[in-house]
């Protein structure tokens, strides 16, 4: 089931294949469907949302059912266990503590001649958070997306998630949303939810930024609306890449690989090690742990299609293969992970050492688990406070400072053929030099 590869060229080919697993002709067909859904939501608003909820979720809603009301929110607390509520609050505390250290702070710099330069950070007006739902429940994704928005100071935070077959939202999701500070919750999902957040409907006001993971339809919808709203990233199937040496425990490695593969049939789990015996023992451990796995069929399919065990010449070669893949999650299960870290350039989140399984980061370590996938860690980052903030440059000049750069600006504007740019400086300097002389406009009047 798990393929063992010992040739570098074959390993490179397979890693590229797995990284491109979402790029298919089927995606092109799905994009056409998503485009139609978005257009209908833009034109028909709530009517389209209700129709698509019935079609895709098999749930019939009335217009007033889209919003999750106070009674359902209050009742959610009665339907979660004390242990789960305690875990949600612990996760919230740790996630919030981490993100408070990441707030982008405004600054100004005072230079000679009275020049002031700086940057001013402000939150977006409204953030939309997409949380997968239906039969599944992901309260951790609520915490990981909502808390950075709250810390950023976003005044309106909206959460959308598809209902279950009874038309309800999982109580754990509702509790996590309330604990995190979400302001509005709507029971809609899929591409239609992204359309509602982008264009607005009678019930749902539009937002400025959309964040959160979803299926291929949600991802394509985010891709198509980007530019009208901001987005965090285009999420693909989940993935983990583990670099291990002889100090690693194959039982732990197998568990970490299965933890990724059990997500869905497109998930990827890759182990790279210079220790051939460790590679073989890990494959054996995977087989043993799969015997009574409750999601065995799905997990086996994932491992068969997108699971690899690669034996390399050394750890440097392993790091090079990891950089080629640019994984969402990277585990460094080696004797000195901080030394190996120096060779790592591309990864969404990096877990260092034998006692740091990815699951710690998935739930409560602090950094968001909403991370770049499908090789996008080469240029993208995970969700954070900065996802919900934007920056304005600050510039102030005095007449004296403007005079010192006037000649340079005049030369540059002349080179670009933009005379009014030059005039905007020249006219000011003329007035500053002769404050009592009339400007050209005054002369013409």
Swiss-Prot record:
Its EC number is 1.1.1.23. It catalyses: L-histidinol + 2 NAD(+) + H2O = L-histidine + 2 NADH + 3 H(+). Its cofactor is Zn(2+). GO terms for biological process: L-histidine biosynthetic process. NAD(+) binds at residues 130, 192, 215. Pathway: Amino-acid biosynthesis; L-histidine biosynthesis; L-histidine from 5-phospho-alpha-D-ribose 1-diphosphate: step 9/9. It comes from the Bacteria. Coiled coil: none annotated. Substrate binds at residues 238, 260, 263, 329, 362, 416, 421. The keyword ATP-binding does not apply. Keywords: Amino-acid biosynthesis, Histidine biosynthesis, Metal-binding, NAD, Oxidoreductase, Zinc. The active site is at 328 (proton acceptor), 329 (proton acceptor). The keyword Ligase does not apply. Gene3D superfamilies: 1.20.5.1300, Nitrogenase molybdenum iron protein domain. One of its GO terms (cellular component) is cytoplasm. GO terms for molecular function: histidinol dehydrogenase activity; NAD binding; zinc ion binding. Zn(2+) binds at residues 260, 263, 362, 421. Binds 1 zinc ion per subunit. Catalyzes the sequential NAD-dependent oxidations of L-histidinol to L-histidinaldehyde and then to L-histidine. This is Histidinol dehydrogenase. The lineage of its organism: Bacteria, Bacillati, Cyanobacteriota, Cyanophyceae, Gloeobacterales.
């Amino acid at each position: 089931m798990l393929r063992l590869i010992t040739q570098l060229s074959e390993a490179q080919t397979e890693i590229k294949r797995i990284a491109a697993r979402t790029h298919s002709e089927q995606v092109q067909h799905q994009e056409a469907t998503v485009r139609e859904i978005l257009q209908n939501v833009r034109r028909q608003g709530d009517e389209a949302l209700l129709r698509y909820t019935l079609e895709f979720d098999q749930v019939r809603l009335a217009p007033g059912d889209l919003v999750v009301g106070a009674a359902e929110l209050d009742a959610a607390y009665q339907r979660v266990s004390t242990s789960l509520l305690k875990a949600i609050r612990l996760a919230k505390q740790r996630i919030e503590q981490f993100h408070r250290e990441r707030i982008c702070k405004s600054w100004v710099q005072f230079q000679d001649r009275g020049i002031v330069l700086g940057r001013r950070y402000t939150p977006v007006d409204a953030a939309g958070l997409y949380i997968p739902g239906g039969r599944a429940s992901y309260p951790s994704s609520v915490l990981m997306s909502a808390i950075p928005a709250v810390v950023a100071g976003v005044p309106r935070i909206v959460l959308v998630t598809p209902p279950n077959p009874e038309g309800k939202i999982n109580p754990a999701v509702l509790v996590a949303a309330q604990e995190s500070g979400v302001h509005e919750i709507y029971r809609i999902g899929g591409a239609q939810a992204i359309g509602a957040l982008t264009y607005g409907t009678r019930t749902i006001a539009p937002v400025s930024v959309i964040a959160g993971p979803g299926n291929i339809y949600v991802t394509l919808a985010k891709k198509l609306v980007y530019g009208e709203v901001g987005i965090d990233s285009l999420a693909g199937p989940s993935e983990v890449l583990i670099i291990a040496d002889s100090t690693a425990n194959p039982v732990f490695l197998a568990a970490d690989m299965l933890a990724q593969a059990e997500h869905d049939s497109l998930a990827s789990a890759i182990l790279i090690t210079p220790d051939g015996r460790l590679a073989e023992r890990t494959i054996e451990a995977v087989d043993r742990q799969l015997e009574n796995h409750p999601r065995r069929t799905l997990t086996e399919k994932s491992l068969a299609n997108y699971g690899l065990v690669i034996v390399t010449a050394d750890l440097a070669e392993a790091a090079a293969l990891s950089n080629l893949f640019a994984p969402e999650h990277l585990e460094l299960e080696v004797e000195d992970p901080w030394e190996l870290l120096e060779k790592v350039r591309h990864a969404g989140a990096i877990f260092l050492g034998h006692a740091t399984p990815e699951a710690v980061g998935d739930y409560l370590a602090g950094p968001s688990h909403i991370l770049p996938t499908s090789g996008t860690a080469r240029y993208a980052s995970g969700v954070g406070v900065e996802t919900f903030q934007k920056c304005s440059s600050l510039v102030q000049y005095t007449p004296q400072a403007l005079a010192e750069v006037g000649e340079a600006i005049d030369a540059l504007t002349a080179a670009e053929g933009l005379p009014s740019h030059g005039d905007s400086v020249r006219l000011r300097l003329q007035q500053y030099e002769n404050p009592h002389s009339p400007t050209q406009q005054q002369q013409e009047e």
